[in-house]
């Protein structure tokens, strides 16, 4: 990233407060954050905040922060109200990730919630598998560590702007361990890619015109000239041709993501893998 882009990049401080481990809140916030690739997010997690004293310590740490969104999962109402009061007094945004669901279920059923901290962790191994898959997707996003390719259930390949990261997180929510690799011109393909069962590899592609428009809009969002090598049609066609050549060499399944939602692309991947339990 150029210095100019760094200076213009918007930054949001995401504060995650929970009276349990905070994984639920973190995953929900992260699922929203990935929709903003041009924004830098600074995450701060505060788990096991089970009383007012601990909450006040959190407040003292974050009071000087700017551009803050506080996301919280707190069972007890007095802690919830304390967070809301603090956020309003310090001009911070906030979102209560739990109360809306609990209150609406109560309204529909008349049943009283048990107000048990960390109750979600009694959901069984399926819950922990999902959390593990989400952590795996984050750890091995953008080819950060090639060893992840050998451990993954699915490996996504694709040029820039083919939805690799949001797809990884969506599939992780299906308990699949997903790693992805951006295909960058003149960049070495890790040896591990050639050692993977081709059925586990998904090659993502896009229509050149769609990719051109997406990349141009991204450059405009950065306040930069949209007519660059990155968005040039000749460069895009060369990237897509190189990717197609690699996909043929690997013998992997290829999906054109143009005009497809993340859910539609994920459904094709699950079908290819022979997974039809969409509630997994």
Swiss-Prot record:
InterPro entries: Kinase-pyrophosphorylase, P-loop_NTPase, PPDK_reg. Keywords: Kinase, Nucleotide-binding, Serine/threonine-protein kinase, Transferase. The keyword Translocase does not apply. It catalyses: N(tele)-phospho-L-histidyl/L-threonyl-[pyruvate, phosphate dikinase] + ADP = N(tele)-phospho-L-histidyl/O-phospho-L-threonyl-[pyruvate, phosphate dikinase] + AMP + H(+); N(tele)-phospho-L-histidyl/O-phospho-L-threonyl-[pyruvate, phosphate dikinase] + phosphate + H(+) = N(tele)-phospho-L-histidyl/L-threonyl-[pyruvate, phosphate dikinase] + diphosphate. ADP binds at residues 158-165. The keyword Kinase applies. One of its GO terms (molecular function) is phosphotransferase activity, phosphate group as acceptor. Its EC number is 2.7.11.32, 2.7.4.27. Belongs to the pyruvate, phosphate/water dikinase regulatory protein family. PDRP subfamily. Bifunctional serine/threonine kinase and phosphorylase involved in the regulation of the pyruvate, phosphate dikinase (PPDK) by catalyzing its phosphorylation/dephosphorylation. This is Putative pyruvate, phosphate dikinase regulatory protein. It comes from Lactobacillus johnsonii (strain CNCM I-12250 / La1 / NCC 533).
